[in-house]
Every structure is written in C-alpha cells, then in structure tokens.
From Swiss-Prot:
Gene this protein is translated from: eutC
Protein keywords: Bacterial microcompartment, Cobalamin, Cobalt, Lyase
Family: Belongs to the EutC family.
GO CC aspect terms: ethanolamine ammonia-lyase complex; ethanolamine degradation polyhedral organelle
Residues involved in adenosylcob(III)alamin binding: V161, E182, C211
Cofactor binding: number and manner: Binds between the large and small subunits.
Quaternary structure and interacting proteins, as annotated: The basic unit is a heterodimer which dimerizes to form tetramers. The heterotetramers trimerize; 6 large subunits form a core ring with 6 small subunits projecting outwards.
Pathway assigned to this chain's UniProt record: Amine and polyamine degradation; ethanolamine degradation
GO MF annotation terms: cobalamin binding; ethanolamine ammonia-lyase activity
Domain of life: Bacteria
Organism: Pseudomonas putida (strain ATCC 700007 / DSM 6899 / JCM 31910 / BCRC 17059 / LMG 24140 / F1)
The keyword Lyase appears for this protein: yes
Protein name, entry field: Ethanolamine ammonia-lyase small subunit
Function as written in the Swiss-Prot or TrEMBL entry: Catalyzes the deamination of various vicinal amino-alcohols to oxo compounds. Allows this organism to utilize ethanolamine as the sole source of nitrogen and carbon in the presence of external vitamin B12.
Catalytic class of the enzyme: lyase
C-alpha cells in the first residue's frame, strides 16, 4: 500500500487476467471502488439492452442468402416483446400465419428432411446477430461429409426453445437444432445457446433436448460447439434418441487456435 492506494493490494488481483468473472474488485472502506461500481452498472445496462434489442431477421436472412442458404421468417404466438416476456408459453408456439407457411413449404417439398435449423432471438438478439453466421460456417465445414438434407433456416421472432419442436414437426424433420440468445449475464450479454432434439414434436420437455451453451468468443468456440453438436447428431441417429439418455462424450484431440479472448486457460490452474 502507498499514498495513492486507499486499501492494501488484493492478493487475487493477478487472477483477473485469467477470467472475465468479477473477482478482486477491490474496496474503498466497506464499499466497492467507483470504477468497479460503474463497470457493474454498465454491464447491467448492456444486459438490459440485449434483452430488448430488436431481432434483425431481415439482415440475418440477407446474410444467409449471400452464403447460399435459404431462410423462412416466422413469428411465435407472442405478438410483441412485452407479451413475450410476460407469457413464456406463447413464445413456445408459432402463430397461425407461420404454421400455414410451414405447411405450405412441407407440401411443396414432401418427404421431410434430416435437419431443421431454427434461429430465435430468445433473450439476447445480440448473441444471434454476432454468432449465428460464424457458427453455421464452422458447422457446415464439419458436417459436409455426412450428407444430411436440411430445410431452409427458420428465423423465429419472439421465439423460445420449444418452438423448434413445432417447426421440426411441421417440416417433417428428423432432427432440429435451435440457436437462441441466452439470458444475458453481467459479463456475457451475447451468449448463444444451442438446443438439439431428435424426433421433434410439440409437447416434448427439456429432458428430450441436449444443450450446448455459452457459444461466443469468450466462451465455447464455434468450431468446438460444431464438433460437439455433430457428435450428438451422429449418436442420435445411431441410437434414435436425444436428451438425458444421450451424453456428450465427444473426444477433443486438440484445442482450436481461433481468434478468441477465451484462450486464457482455467483461472484456477493458470496458463499452460
């Protein structure tokens, strides 16, 4: 401690370089320093903004088209953001116009598909805007050899996880992958979640889904998330199930070298 420091140095201070978690914030008397308090308020504001940010489905559809992917823009039964937040049940189902759109698509393309990819804003459209395309790029690279047929990417406004079950059932999809913005945390306003379901249908519980969470640069890399998803998909096709009876036992032979702020190692073990 010196004349410029009102409190002794925190011995945990060095760990701050190894994790984005709020540790070793310091103190001024019995309170947080001004800088730490302002950082907390800023992170809280970012989380609130992420929840209420509008889903730019048109922009995402255009970007998908530029990469050769068709898309369908649908809407859940929740008419607006306020209703979506107040009525989670409505976010799990499609509205009537969207149901009609999917039925017409299924009639024009009979026989079903192996995979339906659904993208919904969830509680963080920011996560969807930032991470959907990079993840799908890595997924396509790794899945090319499997030869699965897929439906157009379905973009659902005001959607929750279970809406993918209805999408998959209407399209006759053997599997669904839901990409959705996770509830923002105070250090992660842009975390993307992935939910995989085999044999989707309306009414399934979370026990029938597998989750891969925290897909973002500071969390799970796009390539690693795609690797884990493909393991689940291949095992699901072999065993004809998903959820609690299907464990992620994918082997990881090497760490990826992606431009990522996550390459800091485990803060408990230090850098390797």
């Amino acid at each position: 401690m010196d004349h410029r420091t009102p409190t002794p140095d925190n011995p945990w201070l060095a760990l701050r370089n190894l994790t984005p978690a709020r540790i070793a914030l310091g103190r001024t008397g019995t309170s947080l320093p001004t800088g730490a308090q302002l950082d907390f308020q800023f992170a809280h504001a970012q989380a609130r903004d992420a929840v209420h940010l509008a889903f730019d489905h048109a922009g995402l559809a255009s970007q998908l088209s530029d990469r050769g992917r068709e898309s369908l823009v649908l809407h859940s039964a929740a008419s607006d953001r306020h209703q979506y937040l107040q009525r989670p049940d409505l976010g799990r189902r499609l509205n009537e116009d969207s149901i009609t759109t999917l039925r017409q698509h299924a009639q024009a393309n009979p026989g079903g598909v192996d995979l339906a990819i659904v993208v919904a804003d969830g509680l963080s459209a920011l996560a969807v805007h930032r991470h959907t395309l990079p993840f799908l790029t890595r997924f396509d690279e790794q899945a090319a050899a499997d030869g699965w047929t897929s439906a157009p990417v379905v973009l659902v406004q005001q959607g929750r996880v279970a809406v993918a079950d209805e999408v998959g059932e209407l399209l006759g999809a053997r599997m669904t992958v839901m990409l959705i913005g996770e509830r923002p945390g105070l250090s992660s306003p842009d975390s993307l979640g992935l939910y995989f379901t085999y044999a989707p249908k309306v009414g399934l519980t979370d026990a029938y889904r597998n989750c891969i969470s925290n897909i973002r640069l500071e969390g799970l890399s796009y390539g690693m998330a795609a690797h884990r998803l493909l393991y689940l998909m291949r095992e699901a096709c072999r065993r004809q199930l998903s959820g609690v009876n299907l464990k992620d036992e994918a082997e990881v032979h090497s760490l990826e070298n992606e431009d990522s702020a996550s390459q800091k190692g485990n803060f408990l073990l230090g850098k390797e």
